[in-house]
Amino acid sequence: VKKRNIKIGLATSGLDYKAIPEIVAAFRTLNMGDPRNYYDAIITGGRRKDVGDYGTLGEVASKPHPWIYTELAYLGLKVTDPTTVIGIEDSAAGVLSLRFSGFPVVGLNGGNITQSGLDCLCCKKVNKLEEILQII
């Protein structure tokens, strides 16, 4: 994805002081280095941070409120054309948040989307992240 110059953002409603250590630990476990070198923007719940720093640009509400994804797209990733955005989610709240933001959703099986009856809000459902490469 990075080789194709596609921007990647991470949006989590988890509070920055809890979410960031978990994200960093996952990257270390997978020998992936610093998440800031992978993601072009990371938005979390919590206090305002500087652009390029871990955390939030100032998220005001958690999912399913659309702010987290609109903030990620327009402020974090500097998107100018919303038709170039696609969201990937495994949670019902995330699907609603993306749809409220006006972005299409690819649902990742394994979360609670199907159990919540929200499959119909996803433009596509996949079992593994690798399947996303065929979509983009």
Where are the regions that the model predicts?
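Asp-based, Mg2+/Mn2+-dependent phosphohydrolase catalytic module
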Residues: 15-136
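Conserved beta-strand/loop elements of the cytosolic catalytic core of P-type E1-E2 ATPases, chiefly
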Residues: 11-12
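Catalytic-core regions built around general acid/base machinery
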Residues: 1-5
